[in-house]
Amino acid sequence: MALDKDIVGSIEFLEVVGLQGSTYLLKGPNGENVKLNQSEMNDDDELEVGEEYSFFIYPNRSGELFATQNMPDITKDKYDFAKVLKTDRDGARIDVGLPREVLVPWEDLPKVKSLWPQPGDHLLVTLRIDRENHMYGRLASESVVENMFTPVHDDNLKNEVIEAKPYRVLRIGSFLLSESGYKIFVHESERKAEPRLGESVQVRIIGHNDKGELNGSFLPLAHERLDDDGQVIFDLLVEYDGELPFWDKSSPEAIKEVFNMSKGSFKRAIGHLYKHKIINIETGKITLTKKGWSRIESKE
């Protein structure tokens, strides 16, 4: 029997009609034959034949219809962020909480391949079922985000740095959504490098519009921009994984050899970095802070 795409990708009540080995046989509302592996039950209780239970319905790669009681965060009626597992020539493969990965086709990803997501990034998606009942991930459109974001109508977030993920990347700017639901636009003039689709980035809030959408920047505040000595120290910290065995009590000779600056210049530079929470100064070492790491995107 052909799969009924009305139930694929959704949560439905199905009747248990039998048990074969470790597989329950279920019947859909239109007579669809659906299988349930016991590993996809949410507890150890046996299901009773003749009773109806709630399941999420999905096709496997061969087109067979399967059910699970482990409800995914994403359905064909619900958008959420899904983790990218890997990318290949077909697109990005994501984890939506099912026993199988789901493909976001390459045609839906940015034309510039360097802006494709990488493993560990998160895409804002829903599930899409095509005419052959294959299941794919569909990226959220601008109209979808407009109906789900949390508007902001005051300046309480101005100059705050928050984490967000791009759901749309264009030459004119980056469109991002935070976990709190804030919708943020970063104009191309407020960035030096374009973030990947789905990449977790730190963005500084610089204002909002009448619709409650936030404007952001990937650039530091003018007074936080580094002088030459500060940039030398910052670049070396990045090169050495965010930690250097130097501090304000290091010898002038060692500082001169590594940084090519006097101890006085070094102390002024790390003092500036510390004041703006770019580094931590600890006994015998300096380390990059989370805010410090967030500057990498803006300096590339």
From Swiss-Prot:
It comes from the Bacteria. Coiled coil: none annotated. Pfam families: CvfB_1st, CvfB_2nd, CvfB_WH, S1_2. Signal peptide: none annotated. Keywords: Virulence. The keyword Magnesium does not apply. Gene3D superfamilies: Nucleic acid-binding proteins (2.40.50.140), Winged helix-like DNA-binding domain superfamily/Winged helix DNA-binding domain (1.10.10.10). Contributes to the expression of virulence factors and to pathogenicity. Involved in the production of hemolysin, DNase, protease and protein A. Belongs to the CvfB family. This is Conserved virulence factor B. It comes from Staphylococcus aureus (strain MRSA252).
